[in-house]
């Protein structure tokens, strides 16, 4: 026989037993349909504090970040057995603000938190303080964009290359081989405040056209200030002769802005628009036909998964399957919408 301590170590991934014995115990647990009593385990430890640092989901931020917050909240609503609470922190979408917020939390709240969830911002101070949290034995799960080299527990993100490929295929699959059409790409390839997910998305779109030798012509209207977008694309809307065949918006806020602009000019039925992300405004534009399709990167599923991974690691010692967990996107078209979609 084996002791209860040995069984606990085998089922929670803790060291102190051989790999062979661990595998034997885990296989038996699966055969017996064993489920750990999280409520009983929670009574033996103090309350876990999970810090979440994301932009506030207001104004234009709500299109993307409201979904991130929603996924975390949904998991926590059903995670009572973990004996955990959220400590929510916000920061403005400005250069350097993410690193400053991490610094403030590290200096003032380090002894009050057990785990951390935030987005991947490619700035030196952000990476530095994520490393500092790791050295203080506070695991961090990163959302949206991986920070290569940063000491995180794991990253949960969309499969951005797949998203770009899917959008390009949507535009070109039904075009005759010799069709000479123009597609306008909009977004911010440097990412919003140094997130680089759009960079991979847009690059994949262009790579797909190159690999398939598509005759489609590409034009770009990239901008960091969304208020500049209408002025940038106005030359493409000036006459029927120069109208693009389609527009691909690589971000949530560009998706909304493009729809607003084309409706303002009464061109929404003349140009195919593929946008990104599932949120109430994008679903409404899809439902009324302004959007042709949406690349749904399942933002709330990403953050739900991140919260689940972090709590299972802290409570059960269960490590993530991979250092980078990529959530595969879906394509939404009007006929695929359910009555529950807002």
Predicted regions and their residues:
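N-terminal helix-turn-helix DNA-binding module of bacterial transcription factors
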Residues: 1-46
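Hydrophobic alpha-helical
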Residues: 105, 115-135, 205, 216-283
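Short, solvent-exposed amphipathic alpha-helices that sit
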Residues: 63-80, 163-167, 193-216, 257-261, ...
């Amino acid at each position: 026989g084996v002791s209860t301590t040995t069984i606990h170590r085998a089922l929670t991934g803790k060291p102190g037993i051989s790999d062979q014995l661990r595998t034997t115990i885990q296989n038996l647990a699966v055969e017996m349909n064993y489920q750990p009593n999280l409520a009983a385990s929670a009574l033996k430890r103090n309350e876990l504090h999970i810090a979440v640092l994301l932009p506030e989901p207001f104004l234009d931020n709500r299109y993307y970040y409201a979904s991130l917050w929603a996924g975390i909240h949904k998991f926590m609503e059903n995670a009572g057995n973990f004996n955990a609470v959220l400590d929510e922190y916000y920061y403005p979408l400005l250069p350097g603000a993410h690193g400053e917020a991490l610094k403030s939390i590290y200096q003032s709240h380090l002894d009050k938190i057990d785990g951390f969830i935030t987005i991947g911002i490619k700035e030196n101070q952000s990476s530095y303080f994520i490393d500092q949290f790791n050295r203080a034995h506070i695991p961090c799960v990163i959302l949206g964009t991986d920070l290569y080299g940063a000491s995180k527990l794991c990253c949960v993100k969309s499969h951005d290359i797949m998203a770009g490929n899917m959008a390009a295929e949507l535009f070109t699959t039904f075009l005759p081989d010799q069709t000479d059409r123009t597609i306008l790409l909009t977004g911010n390839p440097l990412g919003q405040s140094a997130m680089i997910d759009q960079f991979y998305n847009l690059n994949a779109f262009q790579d797909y056209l190159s690999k398939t030798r598509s005759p489609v012509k590409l034009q770009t209207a990239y901008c960091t200030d969304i208020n500049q977008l209408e002025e940038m694309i106005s030359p493409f809307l000036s006459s029927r002769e120069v109208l693009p065949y389609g527009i691909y918006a690589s971000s949530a806020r560009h998706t909304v802005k493009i729809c607003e602009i084309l409706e303002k000019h009464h061109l929404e039925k003349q140009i195919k628009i593929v946008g990104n992300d599932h949120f109430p405004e994008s679903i409404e534009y899809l439902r009324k036909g302004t959007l042709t399709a949406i690349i749904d990167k399942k933002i709330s599923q990403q953050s739900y998964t991140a919260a689940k991974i972090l709590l299972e690691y802290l409570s059960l010692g269960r490590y993530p399957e991979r250092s980078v967990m990529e959530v595969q996107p879906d394509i939404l078209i009007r006929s695929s919408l359910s009555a529950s979609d807002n």
